Amino acid sequence: MPIQVLPPQLANQIAAGEVVERPASVVKELVENSLDAGATRIDIDIERGGAKLIRIRDNGAGIKKDELALALARHATSKIASLDDLEAIISLGFRGEALASISSVSRLTLTSRTADQQEAWQAYAEGRDMEVTIKPAAHPVGTTLEVLDLFYNTPARRKFMRTEKTEFTHIDEVVRRIALARFDVTINLSHNGKMMRQYRAVQGNAPRERRLGSICGPAFLEHALAIEWQHGDLALRGWVAEPKGTTAALAEIQYCYVNGRMMRDRLINHAIRQACEDKLGIDQQPAYVLYLEIDPHQVDVNVHPAKHEVRFHQSRLVHDFIYQGVVSVLQQQAANPLSLNEPAEDAPRFQPENRVAAGKNQFADPAPRERVSARENDAPRYSSGGASAGSNAGRSAASNGGWPHATPGYQKQQGALYKQLLETPAVTPPPAAPSVTSAREVMPSAPALDGHSHSFGRVLTLVSENVALLERDGKLMLLALSVAERYLKQAQLLPHDEAPCAQPLLIPVRLKISGDERDIMTRAQPQLARLGIEIVLDGHHVTIRAVPLPLRQQNLQILIPELIGYLAQQPNADDAAIAGWLARHLVIAQPWSVAQAIATLAELERLCPQMVKTPPGGLLQPIDLQPAMNALTHE
């Protein structure tokens, strides 16, 4: 067969195979055209699930008479005119294929009138060459598109259509998504002459929760946490459901928008899932309605024919930005009291009322005095190797979906850790223990283990969510896992033989501070640098550029102001005291597994060998079995 140019109708039908998947696809394309035309009211009429009729009427700008024929032609659009326009597209449509494709697989009529025209005009295309016919019509300012008998001339496509109910369900879902994208537009949806949905426009700054509740349901609205997050050209707003209240039905609500365009993006979903993974069940998914605003030059929407996907030029930056925004609001909501065996500090927190993070961040407000934010834990709770497995290994294990919720039980990783626990080589403790803080001074010391001991012992099981049962030399002991984790965090923060490894922040955190706070930070800057916290003072602002690994995933907009308050109350605090304070804020109360307990103990023994010989108070509690044995022998 020789190479030849395809007839216009056949070419349009091929394009329709990519754009027009089902009636819902037609509704999406036509409603997006109405929104691009500036419509504030859109009426959608559906008959027989869209197979018989799809009618979209809007009050937008309309189309001039001499442009109607072009509107039905391929690759004709008013949205872009050059490559520069394509690379910075802000309209929903831009391909110029939708109307031509739809008209090739249906009987489409386009009726429109602009404000400066006295009469309306109607256009339709027919025949092999898709010739456009234009005739006068009666119509108000705006546009009406009628799509009759969808797929009437492509039987193969028509037989793949589902039942009327199923097709309308897909249309309803598309309309729901569009209604969530444009709160300022009234949208009405009817099916077979019956009004099914009425979404009234939200005027100005009026609350949007009413429409949100009508679309997502009262259950989502009850657990929804508002997000307002901004950095430079990136802005994130919307709602995410509190993980504890997320059910299987609620998890079906996953709507994300990029510059107002509804999107299915794996990067965005992964960032949100990662932010919620510690608080969700193993089979749970987060529920959210989120809007991402980004510089149009930094995102490519010309990826998918139906414009369902985008490609970010700086995907890692976008991922971390969304992750930090979601983590921030979850931590703000899930603030828990200190889960330690020692009382919290009595000194009141030093918090000015005018602290605002850069970008009008709403989550820089101080937490209540008796509570601190529950923060993501970067400790090496999960390990795929021996005792030297660091927090990076823990994080990668946590991200695979199974480890965060592992149930107690013997595994290969546990066996390797058991072996390493019992074969830890002798280490000569340093003359000054860097992990000793004032907390140890006020707590009675636990009984010292044997001088030749270099291991806390073997983890047998968990007797509660955060208490492990240990065995060594035939003796049993209870271990407070939260206390062990706190000392481990403190040891990771303190400088040792080499300078602490400061991790540069992808998005530096900039906070506004008062004159007194500037003096405090100036005085503490050398200490913070030794702990791996790099700050830059500039007038009445402080910028955090790098933090040590344990602080990498923390909400610094909350943590740093609280740290300033602590330094104001404790001006003579040394490195160990500051590290101890930070460690208390890194510990989060949550159930442990045996594998987590083994990994934490192994790392603690490696970093703090002196604790094995002289455990601090509150860490270990020996169990005396002799009375029970005497009772059994009736002695």
UniProtKB/Swiss-Prot annotation:
PANTHER family: DNA MISMATCH REPAIR PROTEIN MLH, PMS, MUTL, DNA MISMATCH REPAIR PROTEIN MLH1. The keyword Membrane does not apply. It holds the Pfam family HATPase_c_3. One of its GO terms (molecular function) is ATP hydrolysis activity. HAMAP family: DNA_mis_repair. NCBIfam families: mutl, PRK00095.1-1. It comes from Cronobacter sakazakii (strain ATCC BAA-894). This is DNA mismatch repair protein MutL.
